[in-house]
């Protein structure tokens, strides 16, 4: 606003508060409404679909306005946050009835996509993480906080590791240092909602100090993060941001955990996406998580999502999970009992977090009591189970008896949603409250008794007690009986046929009854808040309960999925063997029409005899599905789940790499081929002896010979790698790669079989030994409805090309490549030096048979000049 424009006092107050958070939409409490003004009103009206109008604004004449009733905040606030808006809630800080001046207002909360506690903003099956990224000199630090659950985690490492974490945790908001947007988006993309903070926030000493002060410790060694300097900076930035957004009550954030990279299978963002672990690449599609999520509690659903993207790579904890799943199978009564009790738990994790921040409703307090009551039989059942992991869960569950009993004693079983509605605190808890309720809710009975008593004492049968706003409670007596009125009654009003009186008793009762309801609400709120404060000391114990219940829920879900889909327990071991018999794709088999059976397949990989399988076969035959199902079965096993197969022996993998399908990078200007090469390079530069590698149709987007050459070289590199014999499935249309089996002992050819009957192709979807020489692409085109003339012409061209290739002898060169390979030893012609490359090209272009001695000397002199130029 221009300085020379005089605003109304309220609008001046608005713009002063708005200046503190110019990037946020301000919801300004005005009586019974939250209102937005100026640019905020324009944006809010579009997002919320509410009317845009104007408000008088002094000499500025008017300002845009849009608003909604204050009680509809929970409806409209989530819409703004989901639209990626930061929202400043400005409340009235005093009762308008108690002041004649402008009502004092202040910002009571700043809600952002990453800092939300409102149930309508949150998804019960997903965490709502806020992340902070700090760019160090040699590495990067990251921290994640879900204020709705209290989970606080940190890590540091190279950019690709932080990128993986950001994609797996999928934060709703990411903080980083102001001025580093280019660095952030260059490494992590632009898909995140981000917010920049001043550089002073990202300071190691102040961040460490904030963490020590919050956790009330002398150092961070107990959390295992003392050495993570960049992670500490990121974690401190998150605490500072909570302070900036006025989230001061954070007692439920009780620990800071290190994300232990060495505990989990490495899955980069390409693998998570291409395997469709937690989301489908097609709108409305089904992910692995959709298939296996049979969790009952919201905590279980959130934990299962974490397990899917963080499979274990240590066989001991994997087998402990499998033992519990098997126990559920062996003991169906136990499983059903636990299942029944889990239905009573609710979202224990978020409920207790609401207690910490002072946002817990009376009904949620009762739900907390019900959950704690359900934990007792779960604890006893687990303690008596014939399974070590279940007994350990039972040992960690805390009954929290004292707070459970306090809630049962003090809160009614069916309270209202809000404490200010009254009727929350049980009878018998507080004598004053009981008396006030007696006065407020038994008033009619009391007045009737007074009326009967006075009628009998005075002998006036028509006497009645009533109330008006002028002088409160009164006794009305007809004129025919006014001579019977006692002397201590005070006459207040004379009517035509009657007179009205008050008594000292009625005045005292009036004072009690008129203030009783207000006093009840004040006293109930006080008692309720004291109960919530008492909950605080039980937060750590209840959080442990929530984590153990979530774990139990996930394992129960694995058992139910296995039973429903006929999964078996895999053998998970410390070997380099993957031996899957009659394996099935867990997602595809659930999508098949009723009555159609999934065609199961065997896959065997090891580091000694069959390290690499080259799979050929036509389009639509099922090569891609076979690759994915192998990875999914392996991942399910290492999550601790049973798997879709007749038997499965899984030697632990530490990394799974995929080069399957298209990539997001295509949309930002990179060609399909460049994307393939980038992802392939990432795989080849990070191979380990326990890696599982999936390549699907590598080499598209370039010439056939380029594609064959690159595919060949990559397969050869993986086979000949001196340290890492990565188990690999390589699906390809390049049938020339079948020649590799002859010269590379750990490469084996397989094909996905088809039958050709009467010029029609039948896909058998069965993996068989040996390579395939046909892609049947023209048959697929015909099936897709391609015009017959085009199909016929394509067949003619194919016949001509195949004839030409046979005449040129393309099979002979590929065989010679295999026999003439030099393994991992680099020859003169494999060097990357540009001068040597130029010399090589000069020599290769010589026609030695027709070169004269003089021409040879001249050429040698040219080469000498090239060398001197070096």
Curated annotation (Swiss-Prot):
ATP binds at residues 617-624. It comes from the Bacteria. GO terms for cellular component: cytosol. Keywords: ATP-binding, DNA damage, DNA repair, DNA-binding, Nucleotide-binding. Coiled coil: none annotated. PROSITE patterns: DNA_MISMATCH_REPAIR_2 (PS00486). One of its GO terms (molecular function) is ATP binding. Pfam families: MutS_I, MutS_II, MutS_III, MutS_IV, MutS_V. One of its GO terms (biological process) is mismatch repair. The keyword Acetylation does not apply. This protein is involved in the repair of mismatches in DNA. It is possible that it carries out the mismatch recognition step. This protein has a weak ATPase activity. Belongs to the DNA mismatch repair MutS family. PANTHER family: DNA MISMATCH REPAIR PROTEIN MSH1, MITOCHONDRIAL (PTHR11361:SF34), DNA MISMATCH REPAIR PROTEIN MUTS FAMILY MEMBER (PTHR11361). HAMAP family: MutS (MF_00096). This is DNA mismatch repair protein MutS. The gene is mutS.
